[in-house]
Regions:
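Acidic, low-complexity intrinsically disordered regions
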Residues: 5-249
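N-terminal Sec-pathway targeting helices
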Residues: 1-2
Length: 249
C-alpha cells in the first residue's frame, strides 16, 4: 500500500513537469514557453520571370492560405493574426512590392490575379533583408512571428544584402519568437535554407501540379503550427519540424 502511494505521488509530480502535445511528444514547461496573443504572418513570394505560367496556382495558393489563417482566427479570436504579404523581382521600377502590410486577418481581402505578374530576376536577399528589418520594428517580445519564403530559383539580383548578412540577421531574430520556413524549387531547398540559417525547408516541383501540392502542404503545416502555438509549447519546440508528416496533422 505504501509503495503504491509513493508511485502515485511520483507520477503526479512528473505530470506537473512534462506535458504531452498532440503528437505525444514531451514539451518542457520552461520560461521560454509562449502562448502568444498575437501572431505576425510574413509571406515572401517570388515574382521573378521563372514563375511565369504558374500565376493561377500561386495566387490560388495565397488566397487559400489567407483562408486558413482566417479559419484559425475565427476558431480562436483571442489570438490576433496579422498578415504581411510581399512579392519580389528585379523588374526595374520596384524589386519589393508590399501587397498587404500588417493587416488584421479579418480585413485581408482576396489577392487579385492582376497584382501578380512575374518578370525579372530574383533579389531574394534584398527582399528578405528589408522585410525582416521592417517587421522587426513592429514585433514585440511577446509576439510569435512566422516567416514563409517561397522561391523557385537562386538569388541572383540583390545589391544591398548578401548571404552572410542575411544569415546573421536570421540568427539574431531566431533568438526571439521568430520561426522561419523556406520552400524552394529548382534547387536543393534544404541546402540553400541551411546556408542562411533556416532549419525548416521543403522542396517542390515548379509546375502547375507541384505548385498546388506545395501550397496544400504549407497550409496543412500552418494549421498544425497554429494549433501547437496555442497549446503553450516551448519556443524551441515550436521552431522545429514545421513541415511534419501528413499523418501527424
Amino acid at each position: 500500500m505504501i509503495i503504491a502511494l509513493i508511485l502515485t505521488a511520483a507520477a503526479l509530480l512528473i505530470g506537473l513537469r512534462v506535458r504531452k502535445n498532440i503528437n505525444n511528444k514531451p514539451m518542457e514547461q520552461t520560461d521560454t514557453t509562449v502562448i502568444a496573443k498575437r501572431v505576425l504572418n510574413l509571406i515572401i513570394l517570388d515574382e521573378s520571370g521563372s514563375m511565369r505560367g504558374l500565376e493561377r496556382a500561386s495566387v490560388d495558393g495565397v488566397n487559400e492560405t489567407i483562408q486558413t489563417i482566417k479559419g484559425g482566427y475565427e476558431q480562436f479570436p483571442e489570438q490576433e493574426q496579422l498578415l504581411t504579404f510581399i512579392t519580389f523581382s528585379s523588374r526595374g521600377d520596384s524589386d519589393y512590392r508590399t501587397q498587404f502590410n500588417l493587416l488584421p486577418i479579418p480585413k485581408v481581402e482576396e489577392f487579385n490575379y492582376a497584382n501578380y505578374f512575374p518578370n525579372g530576376g530574383t533579389p531574394l536577399y534584398d527582399t528578405m533583408g528589408k522585410a525582416l528589418t521592417d517587421l522587426e520594428k513592429e514585433a514585440t517580445d511577446s509576439d510569435i512571428v512566422l516567416v514563409t519564403i517561397i522561391t523557385d530559383g537562386y538569388e541572383n539580383a540583390s545589391r544591398e544584402y548578401d548571404q552572410a548578412s542575411i544569415k546573421a540577421l536570421i540568427s539574431r531574430l531566431d533568438e526571439k519568437n521568430w520561426v522561419f520556413t523556406y520552400i524552394g524549387a529548382n534547387q536543393d531547398a534544404i541546402l540553400e535554407a541551411g546556408k542562411i540559417g533556416i532549419r525548416n525547408a521543403m522542396n517542390y516541383r515548379s509546375d502547375e501540379r507541384g505548385t498546388r501540392d506545395m501550397w496544400k502542404k504549407e497550409r496543412k503545416s500552418r494549421q498544425y503550427f497554429m494549433r501547437v502555438a496555442r497549446s503553450g509549447v516551448s519556443m524551441d519546440r515550436l521552431k522545429e519540424d514545421y513541415f511534419v508528416d501528413e499523418e501527424d496533422k
